[in-house]
Amino acid sequence: MIRAYVKLKLQTGLRRTDLLGLTKSHVTPDCLTVTLSKTQKKTGKVLEFEMTPELREVIVECNAILPLSPYLFKTRKGESYLKEDKTANGFTSIWQRWQNKMPEDKQFAERSIRNYVGHQGDEQGASEILGDSIETTRKHYRSNVTKVKPLSSSSRATKP
């Protein structure tokens, strides 16, 4: 289940609350439709991810995980990991157990996947897939890059 989650997050860059809230009704033959929970009440922004072979493959993988449920990512009882208050303690525990099985130098935070997606491609493309403005993408996902011009021999200060 975690591997399917990571694959889908790498393709979509969706936040944890949006991924864990996905149901089969969000999936059509043409696209995966997601109303972003962060801006749902403000703007109601909707992202439609084109149904590529890779996206279809990971959705089929999610649907194959038992038990049968309307949720793509579900508990052993078929319920959503996402609670009404938008917490996902059960999922967090599973994530931590999965990470603890990895060598320490290979472990990573769940939210770092969204950061990774935000660094891929050009700013416009990253902004579109994340559902953010270019300014937000620049601020949150590309802010650790500062363009610096190196000193040239003619611009170095001389010793006093």
Predicted segment positions?
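Conserved catalytic core of the tyrosine transesterase superfamily
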Residues: 1-7, 27, 31, 40-41, ...
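Basic, Lys/Arg- and aromatic-enriched nucleic-acid-binding interface segment
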Residues: 1-16, 20
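Short, basic (Lys/Arg/His-rich) helix/loop patches that form interaction surfaces
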Residues: 2-3, 12, 49, 66-68, ...
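Phosphate-coordinating loops and pocket residues in cytosolic domains that bind phosphorylated ligands
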Residues: 21, 29, 139-143
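Catalytic core segments in nucleotide and nucleic-acid processing enzymes
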Residues: 24
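Beta-strand residues in well-ordered beta-sheet regions across diverse protein folds
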Residues: 33-35
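C-terminal catalytic core of Y-nucleophile DNA break-rejoin enzymes
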Residues: 40-61, 69-97
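DNA/chromatin major-groove-contacting recognition/catalytic segments
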Residues: 47-50, 61, 128-129, 138-160
